[in-house]
Structures are given as C-alpha cells and as structure tokens.
Amino acid sequence: MSHLWCWLFLVLCLACLVLSIEAKDSDGDGLLDVDEINVYFTDPYNADSDQDGLTDGLEVNRHQTHPQDKDTDDDSIGDGVEVNNLGTNPKDPDSDDDGLTDGAEVNLYRTDPLDADSTTTGCPMGGGAEVRHRPQNGDTDDDGLTDGAEVNVHRTNPQDGDSDDDGLSDGAEVNTYHSNPKDGDSDDDGVSDGAEVNPKLKDSDGDGLTDEEEIKLYRTDPFCADSDFDGLLDGEEVKVHKTNPLDGDSDDDGLGDGAEVTHFNTNPLDADSDNDGLDDGEEINVHGTDPEDPDSDNDGLNDGDEVNVYNTDPEEDDSDEDGVCDGAEVNVHHTNPKDEDSDNDGIPDGAEINTHKTDPNDEDSDDDGIADGAEVTLTDSDGDGLPDEDEVALYNTNPANADSDYDGLTDGAEVKRYQSNPLDKDTDDDGLGDGVEVTVGTDPHDATVTTTGSRTAVEINVHGSDPNDEDTDDDGLTDGAEVNLHRTDPEDADTDDDGLTDGAEVNTYRTNPKLADSDGDGLSDGAEVNTHKSDPNDGDSDDDGVPDAAEAKVKDSDGDGLSDTDEVRFRTNPKLADTDFDGLTDGAEILKHKTDPRNRDTDGDGVADGLEVNTYGSDPKDADTDDDGLTDGAEINVHDTNPTDADSDDDGLSDGAEVMTYHTNAKDGDSDDDGKADGAEVSASTDPWRSDHSV
C-alpha cells in the first residue's frame, strides 16, 4: 500500500513540473517557452528572435508576422520599421496598392508608401537620382537611404552620407551601382568604387557636370541631364546661369528657368527682371506686359505702379481716354488717371489742358462763380454755330477752328444742316468733298452720282473701278457694297492688308474689313485665322486670361500642340513631340485624350496609349475597355480577342468568363463544334468542350 502512495506522489510531482515548464515565459515576449520551442521554433530566451524590432509575442499575437523573418513581406523594410516608424503593413509588400513595394517607395523612389498618389520629387531615373528630403522618410544624411534602411538593412551610418568614404553616397551604391556601401573597394581591385564609376565617361548624362560633381557637390542625378525638368541642363544651370539645378523656378517668379532663358530673355535669378514691381510671371501670364520693359505702354508710369498703386491699365497709355497719358496725369497735372474729368466740371481733363487752358483740378478755374463747363458751353470761340463745349464733348471738333476737316463747310453747317461728318471731308467716301458736293448740288451722303446711262461718275472719275464688273477686285463684295456700305476699296481685295479678303471679313469672319486687327489683340485678322486658328473677334480666344498675341509669342519647339512653357509646367520634353514614345503627341495626350504624356501606358494594361487610340480603338485610361474581365493587354497580346467587345465571338459568354471560368475559346462561339454556342451550353449545364456532353 505504501508503494502505491509513493508512486502516486511521484506522478503528481512530475505533472506539476511539466505544468510549471509549460506555463513558463523565460524572455517575457508573450509566448510560452514550450510554444516557442515546439510551435514557432523561436528562441525562448530571446524576446525578439529575428531582431526586427518586434517581440515574438507581438509578431504572433498582434501582427501575425513571422517571428523568425525580420521582413515578413520581403519588401526590403523590416517588420519593426514598418510597424513602429512607417505605419505600413508588414504583411503587405505594397501597403497602398500603387504597384511599388513599400521598400521601393521608401528607399528608391522616395514616395509615400501609404499614399498611392504620392509623387517622387526628383528624376524618375533610378535610385541614383538625388531628391529633396521628405521628413516622413527619415533620411538624416540625405544619402538616398532612410535611416531605418541604413540601420536595419544595410548596416550603414545614417548620419554619414558616404559611410565608406569612397566618393559614392550610400544610396547611390545601393540603388544605382549595387556596390557595398560599407566597403570603399567592393571588388577589391585596388581602385575605390567612386573612382571606378564610369571610368571612360565621367559625365554619364552629358549635362556638363561630372558624375562626381553631381553626386558630391550639387546632389543632382548623374543619369538625368535636367534634374529639375526646367529645360536647362544641370551643367548649364550651374556654370552659365547660376540657377539651382534642383529647382525648376529658381527665382519663384512663376516662370521656369528654361522658359526665362530660352523664350522670354528674362533673368532666371531675378523675379522682377525690369524692376517695375511685378514678377516676370505675373507680367506675362496675368497682365500681358513686357517683363523686360518697366513701362510697357510708355505712359510715364512703371507697370508695377499702374497695377499696384494707381490701378490703371499698364498696356494702355491713357486709361481714362481723356486725352492725357497716365504718367502726365500723375506726375505733371496731378489729375486722376482713371477719371476723364477729375474736377467734375463737365470738361474732360485733356480738353481743359490742351484746348481751354483751364485747371483740370478746379471746376471754376477763374473763380468767377461759374463752372468751367458752363462757361465753355456758352462760348463759340470759332463762330461756327457750335458751342465750344459741344465741339469738345459731343463732336470732338476743334472749338478754335470753324471748319475742322477743311471741306469748305463749317462744323455747325455740317452738324445742323447737312448732317455730314464735321471730321470727315468726304462723308460718303465718294471722292468728292462735302463742300464740293453742296456746291454742285449733289448729296454728300450718297456716293452715286448719276450720269447719262447706267454708269456712275464716281466709278468712272473717282474710284477707277470697272463700271461693267460688279466686283472689280474679285473679293466677294460688289463695288457698290464696298463704296456705299463697307467703305472699302473696290480695287483692293484686302483693303486693310490683314491677309483676309474684304469679302471673307464681311461674309465669313464678321471682322472689320477696314481694320487689320478687329479685336485689338495685337494679331492681324489674317494671322489669327490662317496661322494661329484663334478668333479674330475675341482678344482672348481661349478665355485663359492671356491675350492671343501674348500666347502667339510663346514657342512650340516640337510642334506637339503645347507651348514650350506649358511643357515645362507639365514636365514634358519641349523638344520632343512625344515624350514617352507611346505614339501620341504630348499635346494630344493632355488636351484630347487626358492621358499621361510621361507614361507610355497610362492605364497599365500592357498596351501603349498610342496603340490603344490609333490601332485598337480601346480606352488608354481604362485597363479593361469592354469590362469583360480581361485587361486590354491580355486580350491583344495573349488571347487575340477584341478589347472593345466584351464577347468577341458572340456566344453569350464574356471573354473573361470564357478564359478564366469555363476555359473555352473566347474567339470561337462553339468551342467543341457540336452546333451549340458555348453560352447556350453553359446555360443548359452541358460541357462546352465536349459535344452534347452533360456537366
């Protein structure tokens, strides 16, 4: 009996010992030692078996990562860095599903691994491109590797951009040259890695800077000739223009450095090249003024003062059209350049200064108790029958000259009796002066002077046109219409020499055939119609706030439909019509198709944008144009189906269903040739791959 009790006691002790061992967590990582040994194969005496910054317990119980693999998702970022520093998913190599692994985004492209729309801040040419520092990426020494990558992956010094002092930054060694950032001579040949880089071509991108200068001095990309995409080579920026090769707009004036140097001839280091108080970009893009001329309209006020102080028009020398230029009003007469009658006496400032010699700032210049305007109204200085005030304010005639147009009729007679124009000696443009017509008894309003027969004396004696040809100059307007209606020259098909015939101007474009620039935008009507395809009746045809003439001055070097300035803004190549070589010009991509001119396959379906538009008719912005479950690229390159037809063989099954679900021939409506369409067989639960066979 005593033996039995001894045996039971021994069994009980052993059980307690086992329970004690099984309940033990030696390293305090949240996993029992027995589980670490038998289940997870981790070290029960090391809380972080894979040294990734997460305890084994956290990896198993919270994050479901591998406690023996410091980088569970193989994205080149340790699990601990992902959880503790970046906030990315340590089990998903591409946390934001943008097609780039988290490691590539953090260590190579320097984009946000949690934002699918984040963009790189340097040349997308590879890891050697030096980019601006992003604090969230934590790159203390700006060597192109995050501190976490340096410490946890490469074991380099996160505070030394060139840990092995070989002349190459740690980032360049890892991402571009694939050399050892901790070994100055990775191949042990006696020549440092920095000295070996491109030994026969010291300037890899041909930008005028050696690779060593780009890496060590300027932080530019030795494989990208124009690191900031401003249209100037990095070497040209550093050595010639002294601009920042990492900043496309060195002076922050709204114009790219390349545009300033190449097109506008402004100073890319001075935001206000003409020192007129307006930034160069503001002058070109907003006001249409000349960034190299401080006084674009030559009115005596600089452009900046006109815009910022006086609120006058920097392109109009007489903003209030009172006959006195803005500068004279401000600096000489001290009148208001935006008010044609500064003293409100009823006489425009110009008339007071130039005609009446009164004070434009004093409504009663002679202090006689009668306003200047009233005094002028009562006076007829030239005795032509029109008060001086009416001559100035209504008819714009000379109050000191009774016959302003020297046609033999007084201004008063023309206005009151004959209703002819006192400023036009030949009101009806028939070649006979108004005074002559009154003298001989003809009508100064009627250009037709009847003779015996059907011909007119005007045609025979004055205009020289052919009385037997109703359209002497073949411009599309009859001679009568030209003389009597439009006041154009019946012998000159293009009276205003603007490049459009008078008939085209009147009948087609509705422009003024006597005015070469109908909309006053600085471009002739012919140039607008024939060259620039702009509206000759609208000074800003595209309503973008920039006058047509200013836009016409902007160069389109590659003829892709985008101005070089716009290309700098869109970061395309202004000297290459198709920057991404996808078969569509940059202009067509931006203005028409809304695709990415720097990505030859905008929707990532495996088919270049140009082929989608020009060859297959598919949508370059939709990877699956016909929504059949197959990408356009798969349809074109693999299955030879129609990417714009969801059911290429019209059998009642979509191409995607045939390929991925039923494994039938998406190009053959009856895969088994049994006389029944694949779709009908699926509906009838028969096998579309076997003749009349039930599934």
From Swiss-Prot:
Regions crossing the membrane: none
InterPro entries: Ca-binding_acidic-repeat, EF_Hand_1_Ca_BS, TSP_type-3_rpt
Span list, region Disordered: 45-695
GO molecular function, one term: calcium ion binding
A Pfam family: TSP3_bac
PROSITE patterns: EF_HAND_1
Compositional bias ranges of the Acidic residues kind: 271-283, 291-306, 313-324, 361-370, 381-392, 467-477, 491-500, 537-546
Signal peptide coordinates: 1-20
TSP type-3 repeat ranges per the UniProt record: 24-38, 47-56, 70-82, 184-196, 202-214, 248-260, 294-308, 317-329, 340-352, 363-375, 379-393, 402-414, 425-437, 470-482, 493-505, 516-528, 539-551, 555-569, 600-609, 623-635, 646-658
Stated name of the protein: Calcium-binding acidic-repeat protein
Protein keywords: Calcium, Endoplasmic reticulum, Repeat, Secreted, Signal
Biological classification of the source: Eukaryota, Discoba, Euglenozoa, Euglenida, Spirocuta
Organism superkingdom: Eukaryota
GO terms for cellular component: endoplasmic reticulum; extracellular region
Biased composition annotated in UniProt, kind: Basic and acidic residues: 59-70, 589-603, 665-679
Predominant place of localization: secreted
Subcellular location: Secreted; Endoplasmic reticulum
Function: May function as a calcium-binding protein.
